[in-house]
Amino acid sequence: MLFKKSKAIIAAALSAAVVSNVMVATVASAAGTRTKPEAFGEDTYAERFLSLYDDVVTNGVENGYLSKNGSSSSAFGIPFHAVEEVIIEAPDYGHETTSEAMSYLVWVAAMRDNIAKNMTDQVDEGDLQYTADLAKAWATMENMIPTVQDNFWGGQVSAQYCGEYDNPEDCPDLHAADANKTASNPIHSYFTQAYSGQKGLYLMHWLADVENWYGFGSGTDFTFINTFQRGEQESCWETVPHPCIEERKYGNPQRGMKGIFNRDTEVAMQYAYTNAPDAEDRAIQAVYDANRWGVGDSNVSAKAAMMGDELRNNMFDKYYQTIGESTSWTNGNAGYDSAHYLMNWYTSWGGALASSGQNWVWQIGCSHAHEFYQNPLAAFALIQDADLKSGMKAQDAVKDYTTSLERQMEFYLWLQSNDGPIAGGATNSYKGRYEAYPSGVSTFYGMMYTEHPVYADPGSNHWIGNQVWAVQRLAELYYWVKTEGNTTGVKPGGMELDAALEQILDKWCAWFVNNSVLTDDGDFYIPSNLNWSGQPDKWGGSATDNTGLTCTITGYGNTDFGCVASLANTLIYYAKAKGVESSAIAGKTYDCIGSTAKAGIVDGVTGGSGGTAIKAGDAQLGEASLYLAQQLMDRVWAIGRDDIGLTRTDHNGSLARFFSQPVHVPSSYTGTMPNGDTIASGATFLSLRSMYESQSNCKGVQTTQEAIDLVAELKAAYEKDVAAGASWSGNNSASSDAGKAELADFTNVGAVELQYHRFWHAGDALMALGTFAELYPEMVPTTGSEVGPTDPTDDVDPNGLLGDVNVDGKVTISDVLLLNKNLMAGETLTAQGAFNADVDQDGTPTSADALNILKYTIMIITSFPV
């Protein structure tokens, strides 16, 4: 592999911060410096997939990705959100897991089976065996399906109305459950009739404490927990973690933990779960892929079909009210008039524990739908794949998914901005309280446009991951429709399915090709954050240009490898569906990408490449997409490959909230966490999680010393910033101008180096590598000569300054850059420059010399020759 170690460090040294609360790269001491041999080599994309999979899954327990919990001969260990513990995103602790992580495990296992069975000709190293990992991964994922669902099939489910909160401080005093407003799920009986032999819903709860760090469970056992409860302004930093099974063992003796969120003087012993349907859909997508690749498992397909069938619970309004612009309350339910047919943010369900002597159960849907939770590919799979279609046993499943496929596609057509990226979503319940819609707001089948559905701290549609996750599914669906056909009969917006997909993808891919950056030193940048302006046109049955809906790039990044890989995956499927051959990208260079990239957002990125912007419909768009995909994946591998996976040093100024974020606890409530931490008014994020600071505060699994040391380092940095005048008020969203300004002052916190190995990052990287191997088996990773050209006509002074590659009389980072360009891009060196570059004096300037010159510039070494 060309110049891997030095290129990684050089690229990292050149990168710079975008904004203080967005993670960005810096000098990496470990990233990109793999010392172990690759288990299956790295000369093909199949080999790279297998070598990375060997690190992340096969040896996942040893390398820290997987827990020992759950591991057996028929299942993998349960994946953590990340190898590292100090990471605050949607999980508030890195060794929690999510339904998202579980679904990625299923997806990568399906691809592993595919490569092991069908691509042995692409693998020359290692002992490749077919191990039927799909079934093992699905068995692992089933840990996220709750087994405690007492009486859920036997009871009459109710949905008692409670308005959503504008701010966490409003809970629970401002709104309470209203017994006079009670609804019910209109399709609950469908599932009781079809699946009464099951313990309850075959859906995943979204979050679990893998080794019982919080202590709500037993020992170090896997334990279901929850966090978010209190409306759109409740960030992860403002949550109170609590168990899904409430037995009043913790918190308050009479009110348990749930008493924080309601007004009950004595909380009943109960269970409660919430799903995140994009995870179930990703697992179904994986099974569909496996069936297409000939590595499916009939038992897994049957379970995926049942899961998909029951995922129709996510097609309904929160309280089963009519979808429309002037919804008024109706007790009972509005039947299918309450179905929006989109994938909403969640369905939640629960009931009394049998030990309580009570037998009530409840369920709610969700009125809010976000663009990035949609998965038309999963809907297509459930009605197009024979095994999945026949496996859905409940009434009207195929009918509902046919409608849902068309509705989801129309949702994307409606939300696509004039620029290309997809805007936020829609709701049937303004402010979560069925209030009157604002005047002039755009609507979609009676639902109002929402710029940032569900969450506002930070706004839920700023992050670029929403774009690449959502549109990957569209690109893959486009490929399957083009190659295998479509018998669903749907016509979104009056268009054939492939035409609708093409319209969305052409515009979206052109935007990313024009706004991504490939640098001549081997680095890259993609848009990382977007701001939104305007709204879509009112949906009238067909797509419009949405000239009043635009987005603006507010940040570029190069550390979010999961997003980068998902973008690459999208572009690969798009190019293949467009009929692009690998030979079409021969001779392309990095400056064909990024013609309209904005200047000044990233240091060293001066703006567009100067080329002509590629437009939707241009013949070269597919070629540029494939080229960009390959460059991104090859550069990620070169920059980020280390001994356990892929990573790049990050920074995150928003970690200042670790030590300053107040967490609302009602004045009427006092209690204790399992480890004795006090729950009362005045609590902070850290006061409820003192396990981050001391192992003696742990009741379940102990925090590692490495994590404790990192928190101490962050705290010392925070205290320096506070002494210099920095302050986090706790009153602003991190994505608001005021919030950004406050966090920008925490420069010392933002300077702390963070190294992350997120499981989903590895999952997206694996899928992009596997997709290359599947769709373009003839393509191999780009390589280059270890020796660059020189001009032999120059005279050489044998006493020249070693390290001075540009012959300007000093040794600086510019010399590293020039040698890097020489080795990677063929830029000519003078003969004197080549002599000076050979700092180990072995006769040839190589990547080892570039690395040593870099070490000299940052004073790791102090003299030459080396």
Residue ranges and their predicted role:
Residues L2-A13:
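Bacterial N-terminal signal peptides that target proteins for export
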Residues L14-V22:
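Hydrophobic core
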Residues A25-S29, E786-V866:
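Cellulosome-associated attachment modules in secreted, modular CAZymes
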Residues A30-K136, G294, S298-M306, N359-H368, ...:
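N-terminal module-boundary/linker segments of secreted carbohydrate-active enzymes
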Residues E62-S71, N143-T265, T274-D278, N299-H761:
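Extended ligand-binding clefts on enzyme/binding-domain cores
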Residues E89-Q149, W153-A176, D264-R292, S298-S301:
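General structural concept
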Residues V106-K117, Q285-W293, F380-Q384, Q472-T483, ...:
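Short glycine/serine- and small hydrophobic-enriched flexible loop segments
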Residues L754-N799:
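A recurrent domain-boundary module in secreted/ectodomain proteins
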